[in-house]
UniProtKB/Swiss-Prot annotation:
Keyword Chloroplast: no
Stored HAMAP family: ATP_synth_alpha_bact (MF_01346)
Gene Ontology molecular function: ADP binding; ATP binding; proton-transporting ATP synthase activity, rotational mechanism
Site residues (Required for activity), renumbered to this chain: S372
Functional summary from the UniProt entry: Produces ATP from ADP in the presence of a proton gradient across the membrane. The alpha chain is a regulatory subunit.
Location within or outside the cell: Cell inner membrane
Name of protein: ATP synthase subunit alpha
Disulfide bonds: none
Binding site for ATP: G169, D170, R171, Q172, T173, G174, K175, T176
Assembly mode: F-type ATPases have 2 components, CF(1) - the catalytic core - and CF(0) - the membrane proton channel. CF(1) has five subunits: alpha(3), beta(3), gamma(1), delta(1), epsilon(1). CF(0) has three main subunits: a(1), b(2) and c(9-12). The alpha and beta chains form an alternating ring which encloses part of the gamma chain. CF(1) is attached to CF(0) by a central stalk formed by the gamma and epsilon chains, while a peripheral stalk is formed by the delta and b chains.
Record EC number: 7.1.2.2
Amino acid sequence: MDIRPSEISKILKEQIRDFDQKAEVSEIGWVLSVGDGIARVYGLDNIQAGEMVSFSNGVHGMALNLEIDNVGVVIFGSDRDIREGDSVKRLGAIVDVPVGPALLGRVVDALGNPIDGKGPLKATERRRVDVKAPGIIPRQSVHEPMPTGLKAIDALIPIGRGQRELVIGDRQTGKTAILLDTFLNQKPFHEKGAGNEQDKVYCIYVAIGQKRSTVAQFVKVLEERGALEYSIIVAATASDPAPMQFIAPLAGCAMGEYFRDNGQHALIGYDDLSKQAVAYRQMSLLLRRPPGREAYPGDVFYLHSRLLERAAKLNAENGSGSLTALPVIETQANDVSAYIPTNVISITDGQIFLETNLFYQGIRPAVNVGLSVSRVGSAAQIKAMKQVAGSIKGELAQYREMAAFAQFGSDLDASTQRLLNRGARLTELLKQPQFSPLKTEEQVVVIFAGVNGYLDALAVSDVGRFEQGLLTLLRSDHPDLLQAIAHQKQITDDVKDKLIVVLNTYAKIFS
């Protein structure tokens, strides 16, 4: 074997040329104290607020308090294996999560890691969880309907795409059920060959501080009814640390913004923001920030407003996408004047108020029609629904007033009696079993029958049966009528005449 000096020198030259002198520099600090999910860290002098750090055991955290001599870090995970003196490394990044269609059908934690056992995510894009909401110029006023499939809501408290509608009530009044039915109601638009991309609404459910069994049940219902394929579940359950419960809504919102910014439509339900506020209060108190009313920190209003402002309807230059938010707030004994409920009511564009006593009377969904409002929804109602539901709100208000009065007197004149009868039947008509959302055109026909006196002769107990029979008849024998309402989005004179004929015949058969 002969050694050629020229070859050796060539190899050496190549190696010297490829030698990389770059050194990897990372700023490292040390843990001074740790406990209750908060670490005090010394030595990270150049860290920025909200920046991610990594502890020596691989757990991540976020710097929230920047003080003169130390940094307060909240820990995204267990603090059990973190000891005083451990090293902490700056990551130079803000909290971000995976986004995009690859997340549809999956259950992830607050940092976007899959927790459903279906393997790793195939998402390529990532987004920061806490970004600025769209300004005034890119927005457009709410004008497209966001159907929930619930008669009581779509007729009286309509929701539009890009709106923020609060769902508020005590525990066990059916708040999550409203979100669930709204998700299920988007199914027909996602079926093969149904409509165009503009009709599809992608759903995101953020569970904050819920029991794991509750979240599992929610996922199971979506899966059984074929609604999981267009939904994303973000879960920060009761057993997760407070920072995870605090960041989960922001993470879910970032996932929804992906659809909004790509000209698609998304709907996000935060269930519920009271628990996020409690988690934020816990973090703030442990970081020794000064407490305010009900011991919440002073910026808890800003926490919720910056989250809910990210729901928007964008104008055509920005792709016409939308993100609709349905935040949930749990009240204690119907106290709407507590700190968090008043905050969120003032931020949102209306509220759906659910009441325990209505729920126990069997009026479900237990919507209190008098206290519930939708500040922008009427602009998003189709003309057909406006035509039939215009009078129903007034009639129900009069009915409630009279019913309170009628408890005292027995001799009522004919007009009062008529009003009470009509009100009782309309209230019965607005009841709806769970998991059975109705298409808008079917709701229109049913309410048309109620407002035009077709129920007045029936016993209250027969109203439900009348409605079911009418819908079955229309679906089988008169689908053209339903299609006409769906396409024209209004009740033309021609459709009205045909409807009256159908209703007259059906009423005779029914009686």
